[in-house]
Each structure stands twice: as structure tokens, then as C-alpha cells.
Curated annotation (Swiss-Prot):
SMART domains: Ribosomal_L32e. It is found in: Cytoplasm. This is Large ribosomal subunit protein eL32. The keyword Ribosomal protein applies. There is a cross-link at K9 (Glycyl lysine isopeptide (Lys-Gly) (interchain with G-Cter in SUMO2)). Pfam families: Ribosomal_L32e. GO terms for cellular component: cytosolic large ribosomal subunit. The modification N6-succinyllysine is found at K50. Belongs to the eukaryotic ribosomal protein eL32 family. One of its GO terms (molecular function) is structural constituent of ribosome. GO terms for biological process: translation. Keywords: Cytoplasm, Isopeptide bond, Phosphoprotein, Ribonucleoprotein, Ribosomal protein, Ubl conjugation. The modification Phosphoserine is found at S62.
Amino acid sequence: MASLRPLVKPKIIKKWTKKFIRHQSDRYVKIKRNWRKPRGIDNRVRRRFKGQILMPNIGYGSNKKTKHMLPSGFRKFLVHSVKELEVLLMCNKSYCAKIAHNVSSKNCKAIVERVAQLAIRVTNPNARLRSEENE
């Protein structure tokens, strides 16, 4: 079976790939880098002074058509069982399956076999599969 291709593959443009960091997180170890909105009355980041770190806002968002799209052109759908693959049957040209991390190796093998029959793409087909020697 040839590798599945998406129905359409638009050019994915990322407007902003840098992480927004918290104000003064570079200065103090106790302040983590995770973004928190500054709420102080005199805060220069909140007041958007020139030369300060940038605050995230709606303008940095991705294009609605390419949001959550993988570089392959598919969107992910998390699969926990073989039964959940039936949902992807009609939209296998736009969605691909991703096997959840808590699925057992036995069920994982069953999912991969069923995926081959239904012509659905999987992002992690080798998840939890060990070689024959180790078993």
C-alpha cells in the first residue's frame, strides 16, 4: 500500500514560533518561564513599553485552515481502541490516527492491523512494539 496523502496540503505559515516568556523570568530563578499575564499597576510589559517583552494576543494566531495541521497535511485524531477507528473511515484524507500513550502493546498491534485494512494513516505505528528477541 502506498503512503496515504492528504486531500489538500496548504502551505502552513507559522506567524510566531518563539515562546512568550514571563516578565522577569530571565532575572530570577524562582520565576518560571511559563507565560503569566502581568497585572501590576506600573508594569511596563502590560503597558506595552518599547523594548519590553511582547504579550501574546489574537494577532499571533495561526490561520484557521491550517491550525492544528501536521506538516504532512493531516490533522491528528487520538485513538484508544480499534472501535474508534471507524470514525476515521469517512475522513481518512484529512485526519490521521495517533495511538494514545496508554494503549497496551496487544491493542496497539490490533489497531495497526486494522488501520492497514481501512487505509488510514498512523503517526506512530511503532508505538509499544518490541522486537521478537526481547519477548
